């Protein structure tokens, strides 16, 4: 199962458990649902939360454009428009939109329970960006794994690195772990040994300024062989050059105790662009991280910014979010892991 969920979404001809959230329009209608690839054949539609498998021709169908159709009388959960787009604020359950009104926010499993997972065949024609393989920049870590030497991997980041809102984080079926656990488990499998220690010191809601303040305790003290750094989502109001300086500090701090520490810098996914509070400079940080990586040996950039942008060309933000603001669901958690694993090759 693990190898299937980590099969890159940009390869192959079968999409496995791609998440979709069915939401009504304001008039109560439901549009055909665009999948990441135009589907040729639907193999399965299910709820990952309940395990219910829905029936072709009764609950759903496939249209001539490769979209998923929700049929009248379907058992598939359909979320009412007014349950997402709110007229009034609900304390701790909503955020203000740019154009007025409010959007539903939840970290209690609301979105996970409402989403369905679609497995389908497609033509395998991916025209979007493919993450760059940068294993040559991480040669020391690759060599340690190849020789099955003890390896210490540190994940330092915000709530996405903690695991929000993967189902394991929510303590709900199917209990998918955070991307950090997925990545390390896959490395153990690929390289055939268990002596890869994972340390995750990430904390939700934190930005790169906090990362600098906590660097000694949460990063330097561990002296990792490989560090995977995931800050930026909560830096939306931070100027890109200031963000770059903060990340530079972290690079130099960890290398002050281990000059051979190699680093993967994660360019973050995008927040919900409808919200005033979180949308900001996140899309600009890729350039800063790429520039930093060019200035030091042993640093690669895992580009989730571009990958998420590619996914959003065909899929709704609601299809891939765990909280409707700035967290992954199971599907996007898997994509995070896929991008990091591809970057490491």
Residue ranges and their predicted role:
Residues 152, 197, 261-264, 300:
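Proline-centered loop/turn at the N-terminus of a beta-strand
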Residues 154-156, 162-169, 203-244, 268-272:
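Oxyanion-hole/transition-state-stabilizing segment in secreted/luminal serine hydrolases
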Residues 242-250, 281-286:
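Charged helix-capping and loop-helix junction motifs
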Residues 2-128:
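Extended beta-strand solenoid/passenger and fiber regions
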Residues 189-194, 256-258, 295-298:
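Short helix-capping segments at alpha-helix termini
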Residues 124-200, 214-223:
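Serine-esterase "nucleophile elbow" of acetyl-processing enzymes
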Residues 268-345:
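Catalytic His-Asp segment of secreted/periplasmic serine-dependent ester chemistry enzymes
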Residues 230-234, 253-285:
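Active-site segments of SGNH/GDSL-like serine hydrolases
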